[in-house]
Design a protein with these regions (language model features):
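Sec-dependent N-terminal signal peptides
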Residues: 6-10
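Glycine-aromatic-enriched surface loops/turns that form tight recognition elements
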Residues: 2-5, 16-94, 98-166
Length: 166
């Protein structure tokens, strides 16, 4: 039986080689040629590009437990996070205005791959040291103290004057 299997393997290998098969090993992919594209959503009608990055358990916990972590935290953390963000090849991210965030959440269907059903910070001030947040399910705005924690989604302009060269 062992001889039969060995003979069959030898016969198939010989046939493959005679038929013009190529048994050369697959070349390894160079690290510089592997590309992971960051997800974004582009609103072409208003020239805005939105960060569409996965939310982590730590960020979910930050909102629930009132602390800062990545794309979740206080208003000051949100401003700092967006200003220092390098994502999708760009570094000119900012916290959206309430009008911008409401606009994107009024589009039919869920435009973001990664989303949360909780409030998101905006850069628009209200009164009494509060800022507007937008609840994505209904695109309504609400007032929140800067010390409260909410989710963060950064935005950037995509107009001709705002393009970076990579």
């Amino acid at each position: 039986m062992k001889k039969a299997v060995l003979s069959l393997c030898l016969a198939l290998s010989t046939s493959f080689l005679l038929a013009g098969g190529d048994l050369s090993p697959v070349e390894p992919v160079e690290a510089g040629k592997v590309c992971h594209q960051d997800l974004t959503y582009v609103e072409e009608d208003v020239n805005l590009m939105w960060q569409d990055q996965q939310y982590t358990d730590a960020e979910d916990s930050a909102v629930a437990r009132t602390h800062n972590s990545g794309k979740a935290g206080t208003w000051n953390h949100a401003m700092s996070y967006c200003r220092s963000l390098y994502y999708a090849g760009y570094s000119d991210w900012r916290l959206p205005t309430s009008d911008e965030l409401q606009h994107v959440h009024r589009i039919d269907g869920q435009v973001f791959t990664h989303f949360r059903d909780k409030d998101f910070w905006t850069s628009t001030p209200t009164t009494e040291n509060k800022y507007y947040v937008v609840y994505p399910a209904d695109a309504y705005i609400y007032k929140r103290y800067r010390s409260e924690t909410n989710f963060i989604r950064c935005v950037r302009c995509t107009g001709e004057n705002n393009k970076e060269t990579n």
